[in-house]
Regions:
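Short pre-active-site segment immediately N-terminal to redox-active cysteine/selenocysteine motifs
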Residues: 35-38, 89
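The canonical Cys-X-X-Cys-His
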Residues: 39-42, 93
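Eukaryotic short linear interaction motifs
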Residues: 40-41, 69-73, 102-103, 112-113
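Short glycine/proline-enriched coil/turn segments at helix->beta-strand junctions
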Residues: 27-28, 56-58
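A short glycine-leucine-enriched loop at secondary-structure breakpoints
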Residues: 79-88
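Typically the conserved alpha-helix immediately C-terminal to a functionally engaged Cys/Sec
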Residues: 41-57
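Thiol-based oxidoreductase modules, predominantly thioredoxin-like and allied folds used
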Residues: 34, 57-77
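N-terminal leader/targeting and pre-domain segments
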Residues: 1-30, 64, 86, 92, ...
């Protein structure tokens, strides 16, 4: 699986405030998968994230594409390191509740790990 499909939404830099919070979905729980197409671990994790998105409609599932030639991708990579200074590589995950970043690390890349991550 190289591309995630709806209901997963691809984010752009314009979807974030200057402080790194989400502009939209302020009343929702959101999980953001930070991924890259060249990343083997991402390729393994994407089907779990896709299934999580399909099975958990109350959660907004978003993704940040961390590779490619689009100028916005470069902005997104810079934004990732601002939002999550501990970012070390792909894949990684962010949790937002009511539009605000929740400082929390995920323990794994499975659908079960994602369920635990949001609770």
């Amino acid at each position: 699986m190289s591309y995630l499909l709806p209901p997963v939404i691809y984010l752009e830099s314009k979807d974030f405030t200057s402080s790194g919070n989400l502009k939209h979905f302020k009343d929702r729980t959101c999980v953001v998968m930070i991924q890259a197409n060249y990343c083997g671990h991402c390729t393994t994790a994407k089907p779990f994230f896709q299934k999580f998105a399909e099975n958990n409609k109350s959660v907004v599932c978003l993704t940040i594409q961390g590779d490619g030639d689009d100028p916005d991708v470069k902005k997104m990579v810079n934004l990732i390191t601002k939002i999550k200074p501990s970012f070390q590589g792909f894949p990684d995950y962010l949790l937002y509740k009511n539009g605000k970043l929740v400082e929390k690390e995920i323990n794994g890349r499975t659908e079960e790990a994602l369920v635990e991550f949001i609770n």
